[in-house]
Amino acid sequence: MDSQSSILEENLEKILRGEGLEFDSVAEQVDPVTLRKNVCYIVGAVIFNSKEEVLMVQEAKRECYGRWYLPAGRMEECESILEALQREVREEAGIDCQPITLLLVQEQGPRWVRFIFLAEETGGSLKTTAEADDESLQAHWWDRKSPLPLRAHDILSLIDAGLKYRRNPWFPVTQPVDFPCHVVCQRLFLTFISSRADADDRLWLLMSNNNTSHHPRLPIVVSFRTYISKAVSKLIEDCMPSSYISVHIRGILGVQHNGRIPGKTDGICFNTLVLLENTEEGAEIGSPPSLETDCYRWQEVTNQGLKAKIIERIKDGSVLPFQSL
């Protein structure tokens, strides 16, 4: 195996483990994003006690005063995602927590990205009405059966997802990793599986030719004002406009963020698993779709162990869910 193939396989393994890779560059010149100016990140926690009651907080905001919601709030300058989560839970509910895993990422473009965690209580005590402030009125454990006026019903599916993961995890524990990035982008783990009755499945990965590091690199797409997920479709339209293919964003393999230097490291890099499928009737599927640009190339994954891991993650859906709302 040559050194380039070895580096690529090592990097792919890191991404599959959720470790992330240093963010190097994007092809175009893009201004850095700034938290609470042109990007907004929200953290929320799903926390259960031993009775599988879920932690809820009573809102103090005028527009939803007295209603109940999961502990959640906006990230602040110089915070990591985990620090923001722990601060919000402490301020709103009075307890300390430790994240177990990211449970879901939701987005409406870079101006609204929400990170939902499954977490556990590690200390402190539930906030009481005597401690009410601008953050919340009180906190308590909800059995999910007793009537409770909710601020919004979107949290019910989040609570269900937390219970499901507690009982039967369907993707590996995923925590944000500390790598600085100046934009909101995706590193695409973009795959194509060619299947033939007379041969084993073959797996292909899209690789970038815009490479200043001289090492094999996965494509990176930047999101501006529109949905983050649309950046994937745009890349496909640009490099395979004549192909009849469907694009399936399977989910997130890793989240990279630093945030220590306001206006310079407020970006996020999502390592996103994508599957392309040929939809043309009678199409030859022994090879991936033809590329109509020199910016990218297909590379076959020939390491059998690595190929098996990737195909398993694709077919099992064993990735952090990613929702565009």
UniProtKB/Swiss-Prot annotation:
Motif (Nudix box): 73-94
Recorded GO MF terms: 8-hydroxy-dADP phosphatase activity; 8-oxo-dGDP phosphatase activity; 8-oxo-GDP phosphatase activity; metal ion binding
Record key words, sorted: Hydrolase, Magnesium, Manganese, Metal-binding, Nucleotide metabolism
Cofactor(s) essential for the protein: Mn(2+); Mg(2+)
Source domain of life: Eukaryota
InterPro entries to which the protein is assigned, alphabetical: NUDIX_hydrolase-like_dom_sf, NUDIX_hydrolase_CS, NUDIX_hydrolase_dom, NUDT18_NUDIX
Gene Ontology BP annotations: dADP catabolic process; dGDP catabolic process; GDP catabolic process
Catalysis: reaction(s): 8-oxo-dGDP + H2O = 8-oxo-dGMP + phosphate + H(+); 8-oxo-dADP + H2O = 8-oxo-dAMP + phosphate + H(+); 2-oxo-dADP + H2O = 2-oxo-dAMP + phosphate + H(+); 8-oxo-GDP + H2O = 8-oxo-GMP + phosphate + H(+)
Nudix hydrolase domain span: 38-163
Gene3D superfamilies, sorted: Nucleoside Triphosphate Pyrophosphohydrolase (3.90.79.10)
Pfam (any one): NUDIX
PROSITE patterns, per database record: NUDIX (PS51462), NUDIX_BOX (PS00893)
Residue positions binding Mg(2+): L55
This protein's record includes keyword Transferase: no
Enzyme Commission no: 3.6.1.58
CDD domains: NUDIX_8DGDPP_Nudt18
PANTHER family xrefs: 8-OXO-DGDP PHOSPHATASE NUDT18, MUTT/NUDIX HYDROLASE
Stated family: Belongs to the Nudix hydrolase family.
Functional summary from the UniProt entry: Mediates the hydrolysis of oxidized nucleoside diphosphate derivatives. Hydrolyzes 8-oxo-7,8-dihydroguanine (8-oxo-Gua)-containing deoxyribo- and ribonucleoside diphosphates to the monophosphates. Hydrolyzes 8-oxo-dGDP and 8-oxo-GDP with the same efficiencies. Also hydrolyzes 8-OH-dADP and 2-OH-dADP. Exhibited no or minimal hydrolysis activity against 8-oxo-dGTP, 8-oxo-GTP, dGTP, GTP, dGDP and GDP. Probably removes oxidized guanine nucleotides from both the DNA and RNA precursor pools.
Name of the protein this chain belongs to: 8-oxo-dGDP phosphatase NUDT18
Lineage of producing organism: Eukaryota, Metazoa, Chordata, Craniata, Vertebrata
